[in-house]
């Protein structure tokens, strides 16, 4: 480095507060971690000093231990009895709990898990308080968990540096010119322990501090202020790490616990990292880290430093090779953004001993779940609310769910949640024998941002110059459907609104002659701009009207409604081809599954249909009275119309590969078929936050297997259930909800970000033995699986509920690989034998796979024709 010059340029300084800050060479990031957070919350609540040994209790186990108790060799997951033997003066505080039938959580003494549910609200509330304090000092914060977060400090530090060194405010004309020499700063001890090179020749020129050290200095100062502020306001201590990226800052935040902070300088990165193991690095832990160690033959980062990038790519593949090389060299360009807003909430409880045996017992628990969801719902940031409430019931032989929509004008109170779920429970009771219940849950789904400027369908019904008026008794948020009359309706027809609620009927609409729904929509679409006239405008391609951007969505909805309304009106003009009304089978979209056709509709189709249903009502029938009075001229000339109807029917084709039935003359159908066809043959696109449990190879394909269960993140569970839903449609199977249910584990084979294989495993205890040799000796030619009660056996562990492979990847060993991984990974630390596996209602092809798989595990022995099945 040239004497008096920095190795950083003016461009590097300017880059600190622009998009892509994570790539700036002057980047600084902090990681803050609360010290024994749950224990601290209870100590503050009870007014105890931090020096008093304290552990947080849940039932008879410990879930958090403060540092004073750790000094007595007490650890988490010990029982209360064991812990008090080690430290008689140990103070234990049980977490807050809800009692069945109560709507308020309390600190109960010795609660029974059969009648109580844990409440973690106090810790969530304190976590929110801590984050709010941090955001006052630095706004870019990402919550990593309930007790830790990452802070992007680069732009905040740049602002301070420019204030401290005003000469940096006047940049050089050439941004590539080096910055002036950085000042020498004295680090006070309160800023934390600074990790530097162990052996430093301070006479060397390259030891001179540069601007990256200055940025670290002021970042450490901000973090110290944050930690002091948290303690001043809440009395909580926390530890912190400050360095150049999230991985390094998290790595050093635990170096100097509790209640201290650690700074890792750039010249010390190598010395610090080579002393660690690969699995110590963020994102390289768990099973993924173990796979890397096995492939590289070492667990030392020091050895990785001696490996080239090409060597790692050859060993680990194009994706994982560079990832491991960068992380082991201290490079992490992960962007820190605000946390992704949650889309769902779940409150659930397992009843392992005391089952729920009646509706009254279930409603008592609904009161608890409702209070839990209500309190968490109120904590949501912004104007957000769920669209759907869902009830899930699990019994010994049954898992069923029911859901209902939450009206936008309803207050989501505890009473509303209880009443809504009670209604759903009664629906399930009428259809199934749901008792005794072993798992019960209520969830909010489809949580969305509420647009304050949004309006309902009544917003389209503006007054016109034809004396259209509405009764003031109609609420702006009224539910129900509007039955509109078209231009062929009589003048004396009335306009009515209906609702399930007690709403007075509106007065009749006075209309001018010849005015129908299209006229009303047209008035809305081309209405004169008011206060938005000064806004930017765009020209509509459909009608060439200039529309303000603020009204664009409304205008596009108008065209959707108008086009579909015309189409529906035209369809109503086509008379039947026979005197007797013929029931025409509606066109369906999707793959043929049994006697039904199914595939998800496109977003555009769903939007059109939802809008039209809400707008038109009565099944989209625009002309109920007109159909009763069809003019003779139309009814008598039906030949051409009938021929047109037959032509449309003949254009329906069925794809030979994906079995989807669609209309070959409809652009919309062709697009739907294209999407569905690629999905069926190529697999479902999916990605997970967690690491895979198995990697087939580390080449370009990056084939791997993921395991998703109730302990996985909610996002991953949802993605796995979406893939399972697709598989259920493929196999014509009943839907199964796996989110939050302990007994299910989903194994997914992912290739190039597509799920091309899926296996759903569940815990079982018994199954029926099936002997194919006996069936063959009896000359049975049926594909059915026959079971006998006397063949029921216990001792089974793993049940295979679903197993599926995409058509394009069959006969490549994927199903066997999924099954083998299920044997190894379904129960942690235990490898299940083939004799402990049973299959749920296999088809003929499923039987052939089972027999083949058993034979391969028994070296081709004929005894392998014995297998087990169970009733799911």
UniProtKB/Swiss-Prot annotation:
Q: Where are the zinc fingers (UBZ3-type)?
A: 533-567
Q: List every stretch annotated Polymerase type-Y.
A: 1-591
Region of interest (Disordered), ranges: 569-602
Major place of localization?
Answer: nucleus
Q: Which UniProt keywords apply?
A: Acyltransferase, Cell cycle, DNA damage, DNA repair, Metal-binding, Nucleus, Transferase, Zinc, Zinc-finger
Chain ranges of zinc fingers (CCHH-type): 653-677
Might you report a single GO cellular component term? nuclear replication fork
From the Swiss-Prot or TrEMBL record, state where the protein is found: Nucleus
Enzyme Commission number(s): 2.3.1.-
Q: Where does Zn(2+) bind?
A: 540, 543, 555, 559
Give the GO molecular function terms: damaged DNA binding; DNA-directed DNA polymerase activity; protein-lysine-acetyltransferase activity; zinc ion binding
The ranges of region (Acetyltransferase) come to 592-872
Q: Which GO terms describe its biological process?
A: error-free translesion synthesis; error-prone translesion synthesis; meiotic sister chromatid cohesion; mitotic sister chromatid cohesion; response to radiation; translesion synthesis
Domain UmuC per the UniProt entry, residue ranges: 29-285
Family matches, as InterPro entries: AcTrfase_ESCO_Znf_dom (IPR028005), DNA/RNA_pol_sf (IPR043502), DNA_pol_Y-fam_lit_finger_sf (IPR036775), DNA_polymerase_eta (IPR052230), ESCO_Acetyltransf_dom (IPR028009), Rev_trsase/Diguanyl_cyclase (IPR043128), UBZ3 (IPR041298), UmuC (IPR001126)
UniProt feature, compositional bias: Basic residues: 583-595
Please give the family membership noted in the entry: In the C-terminal section; belongs to the acetyltransferase family. ECO subfamily. In the N-terminal section; belongs to the DNA polymerase type-Y family.
Q: Briefly state the protein's biological role.
A: Probable acetyltransferase required for the establishment of sister chromatid cohesion and couple the processes of cohesion and DNA replication to ensure that only sister chromatids become paired together. In contrast to the structural cohesins, the deposition and establishment factors are required only during S phase. The relevance of acetyltransferase function remains unclear.
Quaternary form? Interacts with pds5.
Q: Could you identify this protein by its name? A: N-acetyltransferase eso1
Gene field: eso1
